[in-house]
From Swiss-Prot:
Complexes and interactors: Homodimer.
Active site per the UniProt annotation: C146
Organism of derivation: Geobacillus sp. (strain WCH70)
Classification via PANTHER family: THYMIDYLATE SYNTHASE, THYMIDYLATE SYNTHASE 1
Enzyme Commission code(s) on record: 2.1.1.45
Key word Transmembrane helix present: no
Pathway involvement of the protein, from the record: Pyrimidine metabolism; dTTP biosynthesis
Similarity-based family: Belongs to the thymidylate synthase family. Bacterial-type ThyA subfamily.
Domain of life where this protein originates: Bacteria
Single GO molecular function: thymidylate synthase activity
Described purpose of this protein according to its UniProt entry: Catalyzes the reductive methylation of 2'-deoxyuridine-5'-monophosphate (dUMP) to 2'-deoxythymidine-5'-monophosphate (dTMP) while utilizing 5,10-methylenetetrahydrofolate (mTHF) as the methyl donor and reductant in the reaction, yielding dihydrofolate (DHF) as a by-product. This enzymatic reaction provides an intracellular de novo source of dTMP, an essential precursor for DNA biosynthesis.
GO CC terms, sorted: cytosol
Cellular localisation: Cytoplasm
Designated name of the protein: Thymidylate synthase
């Protein structure tokens, strides 16, 4: 995943200093894209160790339509704790929008179910898109969506995915996002009897927090290792029936973890 390291270099060399909501401050660039061929391996960062358990459980949590951290905590995942209220609630964030988008007429739309059925029915559609940016509900969310939309594309029997991200915590968040959307693409491809194609990231405000700069420089001293492979052990009847134990990451040999504080 040398392209990720090149993005770190880009921000360190070309980023402008900006104040931000968290008060930490960032080095920021605008409008960047990364591409990953999913045929070449599962894009799990190797220049530092990632917590695979958190990535998988978070995606399963989104797909459940859940917006309370209880499920995550019960499974040893704490990545959303800082934003939850005293009851563990986060408001109508990703899971709510993916599974039960509220329209102006009061009806809800299960976008995940819809997009899978549409891929099967009309794979050439240019409307294979899911959005989490529900303007009418943004003020109810503890954290408005950073990765706010994703689109699928089918060609030559392969499913590709591109996701849009308005705000990109490049050191901590982006490696998780890459792996999460890669996993989602594999799952939906399996459900639609397709192979996987390309994964594309498109970011708006792409930044490094100022308290992540030394960690990014350390990471740049490390040589990327071969990508691992994802094994999905079974094909459930629906996208919503996958369990943590269905996934295995094979031959993951990363460099050691690099600790960095989360900007809340």
């Amino acid at each position: 995943m040398r392209q990720y390291l090149q993005l770190l270099e880009d921000i360190l060399e070309n980023g402008v200093e900006k104040d931000d909501r968290t008060g930490v401050g960032t080095l920021s660039v605008f409008g960047r894209q990364l591409r990953f061929n999913l045929q070449e391996g599962f894009p799990l960062l190797t220049t530092k160790k990632l917590h695979i358990r958190s990535i998988i459980y978070e995606l399963l949590w989104f797909l459940k339509g859940d917006t309370n951290v209880r499920y995550l905590q019960e499974n040893g995942v704490t990545i959303w704790d800082e934003w939850a209220d005293e009851n563990g609630d986060l408001g109508p964030i990703y899971g709510a929008q993916w599974r039960s988008w509220k329209g102006a007429d009061g009806k809800t739309v299960d976008q995940i179910s819809w997009v899978i059925e549409e891929i099967k029915r009309n794979p050439n559609s240019r409307r294979l898109l899911v959005s989490a940016w529900n303007v009418a509900e943004l003020d109810k969310m503890k954290l408005p969506p950073c990765h706010y939309a994703f689109q699928f594309y089918v060609a030559d029997g392969k499913l590709s995915c591109m996701w849009q991200q308005r705000s990109v915590d490049t050191f901590l968040g982006l490696p998780f996002n890459i792996a999460s959307y890669a996993l989602l693409t594999h799952m939906i491809a399996q459900q639609c009897d397709l192979d996987v194609g390309e994964l594309i990231f498109s970011g708006g405000d792409v930044h490094l927090y100022k308290n992540h700069l030394e960690q990014a420089k350390l990471q740049l001293t490390r040589e990327p290792r071969p990508l691992p492979k994802l094994v999905i052990k079974r094909k459930p009847a629906s996208i919503f029936e996958y369990e943590f134990e269905d996934f295995e990451i094979v031959d993951y040999d990363p460099h050691p973890h690099i600790k960095a504080p989360v900007a809340v």
